[in-house]
Design a protein with these regions (language model features):
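Structured, helix-rich domain cores that form ligand/interaction pockets
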Residues: 1-317, 340-368
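Helix-turn-helix DNA-binding segment
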Residues: 324-326
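Residues in the recognition helix of alpha-helical DNA-binding motifs
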Residues: 329, 336
Length: 368
């Protein structure tokens, strides 16, 4: 649904009784101030927005001031962004945000907050993969498509040993990453740079049982947001209340997926399997196989497919192994082939499409 949002509120709509803000930067034409949570606030375990005050010279003797509020919406409510929100929770989000602002000695009227200008918005979707598929496998498959041709995205990179795929420009970006693996990355390597202590604590109980693929569309500039909304038939210049919308989130996320992935989907399923592709499929089909066993089975299948197949392989090994061991090798080959035959090449893709079509909020299976 919605994740990070950046709001802009004019200074004359903000009450700040105590001007104990830190001066972050200064020139003759502007000043930048920041307000950070106190140690007591941090120890509370609550999530707080990032506040930045701008004071710019707008005329010869005139200055304009505004407050920038940046925060992850689900973290306000759940202290993590694996759980997703629905439209009915907007009132609770506003209540919580007003509370956090008040704790920072910043006061804004409810109506002014709901109608605040949106400078940037991140829409996202968490997708739990099943049937042995891993986020890293899906990311490696998506990396086979030349996505730069589908959008004005100028840079592409794999990050964190293939655990994330990042397509971006300054104005917008499309990120696909392994959400569970990202929970334990440090701030320099993590995709989510603003992890809460509670969110990081989720890694241990989830790492062995859940594979969560995260799609994230970051509209980092208002001009890009408006251009996209216009293209999708959505009103331009939305305020905070208007961007908090499942309909808008679904439209944006599906637009990026359909334009960048769906139109290239044939490329995902038409290539011949490499040795590494086969290894990945064996790890999915043979869920209990250890790494060494999976490598052995991959080599066995590749050797069985080459030349004259099993007959040539038997002749090559004749002086090294007896009949009993050979029959065991054949049994391994038969069992592995059965498992691979049950795999459907598009299964992981269909799982993603099903979630994007239903677009139901994702929630963690259990909470403390």
């Amino acid at each position: 649904m919605i994740d990070t949002v950046i709001l802009s509120v004019p200074r004359n709509k903000v009450s700040v009784p105590n001007n104990d803000w830190d001066l972050h930067a200064q020139t003759p034409v502007y000043k930048v101030y920041v307000k950070n949570p106190s140690n007591k606030d941090k120890e509370s375990g609550l999530y707080f927005p990032c506040l930045t005050g701008y004071h710019r010279k707008s005329g010869k003797n005139e200055w304009a001031a505004m407050l920038k509020i940046e925060f992850s919406v689900p973290k306000l409510i759940y202290n993590n962004n694996l759980d997703e929100l629905d439209d009915k929770q907007f009132s609770a989000v506003v209540d919580t945000l007003l509370d956090r602002l008040a704790r920072l000695d910043v006061h804004i009227g409810r109506q002014d907050l709901e109608s605040a200008e949106v400078r940037a918005i991140h829409y996202s979707k968490n997708i739990e993969l099943t049937d042995g598929y891993s986020s890293q496998y899906v990311i490696s498959e998506l990396g086979k498509v030349n996505l730069n041709k589908r959008f004005d995205l100028t840079k592409t990179r794999f990050m964190n040993d293939g655990q994330s795929l990042y397509f971006y420009t300054k104005a917008h970006s499309f990120v696909v990453y392994d959400k569970i693996a990202d929970l334990v990355k440090n701030s320099k390597r993590a995709i989510d740079k603003d992890q809460t202590a509670y969110q990081m604590s989720l890694f241990a109980p989830l790492k062995e049982t859940r594979e969560i693929l995260r799609l994230e569309i970051r509209l980092s500039e208002k001009r890009k947001m408006n251009a996209l909304f216009k293209k999708l038939g959505l009103p331009e210049n939305p305020n905070f209340k208007e961007v908090f919308s499942t309909v808008k989130s679904k439209a944006v996320v599906n637009h990026y997926w359909d334009t960048m992935i769906e139109k290239n989907s044939l490329l995902l399923f038409s290539h011949s399997l490499t040795a590494k592709d086969l290894l990945k499929q064996i790890l999915i089909a043979c869920k209990k196989a250890r790494g060494r066993t999976a490598v052995y089975l991959t080599g066995l299948l590749l050797l069985a497919r080459e030349g004259n197949g099993l007959r040539e392989l038997r002749a090559t090994l004749a002086k090294r192994i007896g009949d009993r061991l050979w029959y065991r090798v054949c049994a391994d080959l038969t069992e592995t082939t059965k498992g691979l035959n049950k795999l459907r090449p598009r299964e992981w893709y269909d799982q993603v499409k099903k979630v994007l079509e239903s677009y139901q909020p994702y929630h963690l299976p259990c909470k403390e």
